[in-house]
UniProtKB/Swiss-Prot annotation:
Annotated (6S)-5,6,7,8-tetrahydrofolate binding sites: L119, G123, H124, L125, E243
Reactions mediated catalytically: (6R)-5,10-methylene-5,6,7,8-tetrahydrofolate + glycine + H2O = (6S)-5,6,7,8-tetrahydrofolate + L-serine
GO biological process, one term: tetrahydrofolate interconversion
Protein name: Serine hydroxymethyltransferase
Similarity comment: family membership: Belongs to the SHMT family.
Subunit structure and binding partners: Homodimer.
Protein task: Catalyzes the reversible interconversion of serine and glycine with tetrahydrofolate (THF) serving as the one-carbon carrier. This reaction serves as the major source of one-carbon groups required for the biosynthesis of purines, thymidylate, methionine, and other important biomolecules. Also exhibits THF-independent aldolase activity toward beta-hydroxyamino acids, producing glycine and aldehydes, via a retro-aldol mechanism.
Species: Desulforamulus reducens (strain ATCC BAA-1160 / DSM 100696 / MI-1) (Desulfotomaculum reducens)
Keywords: Amino-acid biosynthesis, Cytoplasm, One-carbon metabolism, Pyridoxal phosphate, Transferase
Subcellular location: Cytoplasm
CDD domains documented for this protein: SHMT
Length: 413
C-alpha cells in the first residue's frame, strides 16, 4: 500500500499539487521573495536523501551511514564559501528566520540591545519586531528611512548608534528598493565596538553575482535564505568570520535545531553550483534590468514608487492618493492572474493587514525569460487593472494579456 504513485495513493493531495502547478504556469509571479527553481534543484530536493537522519556535521555525526550525505553537505559548504568569499558557512538552517535566531543565540544574551531596521520602513520581523522573538528577548532600537527620500540616512543611523550603544547592529531588509552601504554601516559598528550582522536574504543572488556590494568583508556574520534571488530551495544559511564559526555551528546544532534536512541541503548544493556558473551573473543583471523597466513603466503610467525607483530586484508602489489600498490592489491583480503582496510603505497610515502599498519583484519572471519589453507590458496590465477597475471589460482584457505573456514563456515545459 505504500509503493504507489501519489496520484493513486492520495488523489486529493495530488490534485492540489497539480492545481498549484497550473497556477504557477498561468500567473505572472511578482512576489519579490519567490522564484522558480531549476529541474536539478527539484530533483535533489525530491531525492532519497529525505530518508536520512544526520545530526551533527560532516565527519562528526551522531548517526551511522552518513558518508554520502556528508558529500552533499560538504559540497554545499564549499560552494557557498566560494560563491561569497566567506571563511565559514553553515548550510543547515531550515529557514532564514532560524538562521537569524541562531546568530542572536550565538552572540547575544537576553536583554542585550540591538539596532535594526524598522519593519514598517522595510525591515524584517526577525530584526527586532515586537511580535517576533527578536523583539521579545532583546532591547530593540530601530532606524528607518527618510520620509522625503524613502532611503536610509546613514548619518542618522550613526547618531542613533552613538547614542544607544547597541551590542549589535542589524542590516538588511525585506522591502527596501535601494542598495545598502554595508561598508558604511560596518564602520559605524566598529566605531561603537558592536557586532555587525547582515541579513542579505533578498539580495543574495545579486551579491553572489557582484551586482550589489557584498556584506561579507564588513560583517561579523551574514545570513541569507537560499531561495529568492539565489533560486535555490526554501531554506537558510549562515556565513561568518572564522572566529565565530564554532559559536555559530553550536547555535544551530545542538542549540536550536536537531537533524538537518539532507535533501534540502543537497538542493542547496545544486543551486550554489548553478550560481557559480558565468550565466548566473547575466541572469541577475536581467533581474535588475527587469525591475528597472517595470519601475519605469509604472512611473510613466502615473504611479508613485517609494524612493522613486529601484537598484535591486524589487519595487515598492505607494498607492496613497489612488483610492486603492494595498489589500485591494493585491486582490484586483490576483483576479487577473498577477500575484503580488500588499505591503506597508514607510509612514503608512493604514493597518498592516490593509496597507497603502504593494511590493513587486522580478526574480521569478526573469527565470521564466521575461525581458524589459515584457516588463513594460506588465506595467501596462497593472495600470489597466488598478486604474480602470470599474470598467467591466478590464478583467477580461487584462487576463488575456497575462495569458499571452505566460504562454510565451512556459514554466517547466
Amino acid at each position: 500500500m505504500f509503493n504507489g504513485k501519489l496520484a493513486q495513493t492520495d488523489p486529493e493531495l495530488a490534485k492540489a499539487i497539480e492545481l498549484e502547478h497550473q497556477r504557477q504556469q498561468r500567473n505572472i509571479e511578482l512576489i519579490a521573495s519567490e522564484n522558480f527553481v531549476s529541474p536539478a534543484v527539484l530533483e535533489a530536493q525530491g531525492s532519497i536523501l529525505t530518508n536520512k537522519y544526520a545530526e551533527g556535521y560532516p565527519g562528526k555525526r551522531y548517526y551511522g551511514g552518513c558518508e554520502f550525505v556528508d558529500i552533499a553537505e560538504s559540497l554545499a559548504i564549499s560552494r557557498a564559501k566560494k560563491l561569497f568569499g566567506a571563511d565559514h558557512a553553515n548550510v543547515q538552517p531550515h529557514s532564514g528566520a532560524q538562521a537569524n535566531f541562531a546568530v542572536y543565540f550565538a552572540l547575544l544574551q537576553p536583554g542585550d540591545k540591538i539596532l535594526g531596521m524598522n519593519l514598517a520602513h522595510g525591515g524584517h520581523l526577525t530584526h527586532g519586531s515586537p511580535v517576533n522573538v527578536s523583539g521579545k528577548y532583546f532591547n530593540v532600537v530601530a532606524y528607518g528611512v527618510e520620509e522625503d527620500t524613502g532611503c536610509i540616512n546613514y548619518e542618522k543611523l550613526r547618531e542613533i548608534a552613538l547614542q544607544e550603544k547597541p551590542k549589535m547592529i542589524v542590516a538588511g531588509a525585506s522591502a527596501y528598493a535601494r542598495a545598502i552601504d554595508f561598508k558604511k554601516i560596518g564602520e559605524i559598528a566598529k566605531e561603537i565596538d558592536a557586532y555587525f550582522f547582515v541579513d542579505m536574504a533578498h539580495i543574495a543572488g545579486l551579491v553572489a553575482a557582484g551586482l550589489h556590494q557584498s556584506p561579507v568583508p564588513y560583517a561579523d556574520v551574514v545570513t541569507t535564505t537560499t531561495h529568492k534571488t539565489l533560486r535555490g530551495p526554501r531554506g537558510g544559511m549562515i556565513l561568518c568570520k572564522e572566529e565565530y564559526a564554532q559559536l555559530i555551528d553550536k547555535a544551530i546544532f545542538p542549540g536550536s535545531q536537531g537533524g538537518p534536512l539532507m535533501h534540502v541541503i543537497a538542493a542547496k548544493a545544486a543551486a550554489f553550483g548553478e550560481a557559480l556558473k558565468p550565466e548566473f551573473k547575466a541572469y541577475q543583471q536581467q533581474i535588475i534590468n527587469n525591475a528597472q523597466a517595470l519601475a519605469k513603466g509604472l512611473l510613466e503610467r502615473g504611479f508613485n514608487l517609494v524612493s522613486g525607483g529601484t537598484d535591486n530586484h524589487l519595487i515598492l508602489v505607494d498607492l496613497r492618493g489612488t483610492g486603492i489600498t494595498g489589500k485591494q490592489a493585491e486582490t484586483l491583480l490576483d483576479e487577473v492572474h498577477i500575484t503580488c503582496n500588499k505591503n506597508a510603505i514607510p509612514f503608512d497610515p493604514e493597518k498592516p493587514f490593509v496597507t497603502s502599498g504593494i511590493r513587486l519583484g522580478t526574480p521569478a519572471v526573469t527565470t521564466r525569460g521575461f525581458k524589459e519589453k515584457d516588463m513594460d507590458k506588465v506595467a501596462e496590465i497593472i495600470a489597466l487593472t488598478l486604474q480602470e477597475k470599474d470598467n467591466p471589460d478590464t478583467q477580461e482584457k487584462a487576463r488575456a494579456m497575462v495569458k499571452e505573456l505566460c504562454d510565451k514563456y512556459p514554466l517547466y515545459a
